[in-house]
From Swiss-Prot:
Protein name, entry field: Photosystem I reaction center subunit IX
Pfam families assigned to the protein according to its UniProt record, in alphabetical order: PSI_PsaJ (PF01701)
Function text: May help in the organization of the PsaE and PsaF subunits.
Keywords: Membrane, Organellar chromatophore, Photosynthesis, Photosystem I, Plastid, Thylakoid, Transmembrane, Transmembrane helix
Keyword Membrane: yes
Membrane topology: Single-pass membrane protein
Organism field: Paulinella chromatophora
InterPro entries: PSI_PsaJ, PSI_PsaJ_sf
Originating gene: psaJ
Bilayer-crossing regions: 4-24
Taxonomic lineage: Eukaryota, Sar, Rhizaria, Cercozoa, Imbricatea
Principal subcellular localization: plastid
Protein's cellular compartments: Plastid, Organellar chromatophore thylakoid membrane
Superkingdom, taxonomy of origin: Eukaryota
Gene Ontology BP terms: photosynthesis
């Protein structure tokens, strides 16, 4: 449990950074798809 408490915040921080980076890159190449959904 101690190992989980130390790895969970690190993993979530990396995950949110990757997700934000993907969203920013997707928004840069396809700006209309993100704000005007089907």
């Amino acid at each position: 449990m101690k190992k989980f408490l130390t790895t969970a915040p690190v993993f979530s921080a990396i995950w949110f950074t990757l997700t934000a980076g993907i969203m920013i890159e997707f928004n840069r190449f396809y700006p209309d798809l993100l704000f005007h959904p089907l």
